[in-house]
Amino acid sequence: MKKRIITISREFGSGGRTIGRQLAERLGVHCYDKELIEKLAEQTGLAQKYIEEQGEYAPSMNRFSYAFVGRGVNGLSVSDYLWNEQRKKIQELVEKEPCVIVGRCADYILRERKDVFNIFIHAPQSERAKRIVEVYGETDTEPIKRLREKDKKRAINYKYYTEREWGRADNYHLTLDSSVFGIEGCVNLILRVLDEIKEK
């Protein structure tokens, strides 16, 4: 069966966002990453920066304590409200067109669909640390510490909303080490796999 929707989950600094954009360009479809944040900002009235930071990295506290903070929209925490709106927007987008979606727990949100192909991009910490300095520049925080903090928050967020383990192989159809294949190599491999699936 042809896979219309591709989701890209990724470790911080693995190049997953770039892979998603290049893949979408090669497929001739939209890539929803920053664009999804813009649409959510329009829909919710929340600031884009807040959505970008909270959509994948909240909650950073344990589940019990988090349940009692940040209430404000129909009795929901702002993050829970954002999750609901994000879920609805993703489901709406995939009904309209084939696309690539980066992050945002899209693999879980679309888990009931048969036309979705879920990918996880990872790489060794040393390689990711180099990349985040190249892409984002130096900060006061050591690169390894930065990526560990980001990954930890993504994992907590994913677990909180999906009750699944972030990065666990059986949540995805394909996992790739971008340090082995490179960005372009990952894109080429994904396209080959999609072609193989299409023929079955």
Region annotations inferred by a language model:
Residues 2-11, 97:
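Pre-Walker A (Motif I) flank of P-loop NTPase domains
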Residues 41-98:
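ATP-dependent small-molecule kinase phosphotransfer cores
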Residues 99, 106-112:
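RNA pseudouridine synthases
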Residues 112-134, 140-150:
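Conserved phosphate-donor/acceptor-positioning beta-strand/loop module used by diverse small-molecule
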